Design a protein with these regions (language model features):
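Short amphipathic alpha-helix that is part of the acyltransferase structural core
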Residues: 1-17, 30, 120-121
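Short, small/polar residue-rich loop motifs at catalytic or cofactor-binding pockets
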Residues: 21-23
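Cytosolic beta-strand hydrophobic patch enriched in CBS
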Residues: 26-30, 86
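Conserved beta-strand in the GNAT
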Residues: 28, 34-42, 47-55
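Active-site beta-strand termini and strand-to-loop segments that position acidic
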Residues: 30-32, 112-114
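Conserved acetyl-CoA-binding loop-helix of GNAT-fold acetyltransferases
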Residues: 62-75
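Conserved active-site alpha-helix within GNAT-family acetyltransferase domains
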Residues: 79, 83, 89-112
Length: 121
């Protein structure tokens, strides 16, 4: 677990580290005896699951590791009978290459940065 936490720490602000214990399935990619990537599947219901905490060590990026990890999450979701799989990401083109799409009919998540935020009063 320490190796996984170390990998996730390489991506501060990009991965939700506090939710690591809540994931349903967690997958790792290895090179020899080293963990070089990880990805989690969070199942919310019989219908919906999320691909999350996807990380690949910078020395091993652009070699298909991330795609294999997402494919494994997708396989697990299918095995569990999940109907819809989503990812919250800033790398939309990566997920689009794997068959994910943005649905305009869905609600949009809106965020407000509160650190340093001052009230209008």
């Amino acid at each position: 677990m320490a190796a996984i936490r170390g990998l996730i720490r390489l991506f501060p602000g990009q991965l939700v580290q506090k939710n690591l214990p809540r994931v349903t399935s967690f997958f790792v990619a290895t090179a020899g005896d080293k963990i070089i990537g990880c990805c989690a599947l969070q199942v919310y219901s019989k219908r919906l699951a999320e691909v999350r905490s996807l990380a690949v060590h910078p020395d091993h990026q652009e070699h298909g590791v991330a795609a294999k990890l997402v494919e494994r999450c997708t396989e697990r979701a299918r095995e569990e009978g999940i109907k819809e799989l989503f990812a919250v990401t800033s790398r939309t083109s990566f997920f689009e290459r794997l068959g994910f799409a943005t649905f305009r009919r869905e609600k949009t998540a809106m965020f407000l940065e509160l650190s340093g935020h001052t009230s209008a009063e």
